[in-house]
Regions:
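Helix-coil boundary/capping segments in enzymes
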Residues: 1-292
């Protein structure tokens, strides 16, 4: 490049969402009364979403102006505000129980509809990331198809599955229809840092422990999908690990290759003891998977 050339800067990790009450038109009408009752008593726990600057999450003109002032011309848009029927930001929420699922799923679908309109307001400059839940795989697959058709180009946000969750771990074959449709439609699977940590309680040290451990819990998605065979069955599947740094990747790939070689490729007693005859389902070594 010469000194006169200009870089194109795209942010791969921006966040946005609607103001709380503005989600109502995007909800199915059968949930409107429930939404009114919930919104009337809901107290937002985030100071930044109560401040005068909160509208940068949903004010399209302001957002474009501020991004351009920073030299950014386009963005990948993750969620940031509170969708209907959630206690806090959906990115950090635990997987819903069976009793919570129906309402929260309706809330995420409302966000996805809002996001499609928000992205359409700046064509080619916003790659919206659609949200799904893992409780109902068939419903998630339908939503992936719908949001792709609606113009959301940032992929899906893969929810975290902390240990002890109400849904299967990410290596489970139950999620194969999700990987299949993402491969078919060329939909990236985004896993954002902070979304897979277990609840830590209210002890004074909990916040510090969360900050130390949160990226590690998010890293787990990589080896779950590798050893679960998702990339073998769906070679076009793309996993994006966001807000997790990158310095950890070489060491983790070395570790994963070690266990792949010992428990899978070796085929000896360790494979019989620890892998239960499932070695062929994993496919290539982790480093080869990473390299494409």
């Amino acid at each position: 490049m010469t000194g006169d050339d200009r870089y194109t800067v795209i942010s791969a990790d921006c966040h946005a969402g609607a103001d709380l009450l503005d989600y109502k038109p995007y909800l199915e009408k059968r949930y409107h009364d429930d939404f009114d009752a919930w919104a009337a008593t809901y107290v937002n726990p985030y100071e930044d979403l109560l401040a005068d600057t909160a509208d940068r999450n949903w004010n399209s003109a302001r957002r474009l102006a501020e991004l351009e002032a920073d030299g950014i011309v386009a963005e990948v848009v993750f969620p940031n505000t509170i969708p209907p029927f959630f206690p806090k930001a959906s990115l950090m929420a635990q997987p819903p129980t069976a009793a919570e699922y129906t309402m929260r799923w309706a809330g995420l679908q409302a966000h996805n509809r809002w996001l499609a309109d928000f992205c359409a307001d700046a064509p080619g400059r916003r790659a919206g990331v659609a949200q799904i839940l893992l409780n109902d795989v068939d419903a998630a697959v339908q939503e992936i198809r719908r949001t792709k058709a609606a113009g959301l180009t940032g992929g899906i946000l893969l929810p975290g599955v902390p240990p002890g969750s109400t849904v299967p771990e990410l290596y489970s074959a139950a999620y194969d229809p999700i990987w299949a449709v993402c491969d078919e439609l060329d939909v990236p699977v985004n896993h954002h840092g902070g979304s897979a940590s277990p609840p830590l309680g209210d002890e004074p040290a909990a916040r510090a422990v969360f900050m130390v451990e949160t990226t590690w819990f998010s890293h787990r998605a990589l080896w779950h999908l590798v050893f679960g065979g998702a990339f073998r069955r769906h070679p076009g599947l793309k996993l994006v690990l966001t807000e997790q740094g990158s310095g950890w990747i070489p060491g983790v790939l070395e570790m994963l290759d070690y266990y792949h070689g010992r428990l899978v490729a070796g085929g000896g007693p360790p494979a019989s003891q620890f892998w239960g005859g499932r070695a062929p389902g994993v496919g290539r070594g982790p480093r080869r998977v990473w390299g494409g």
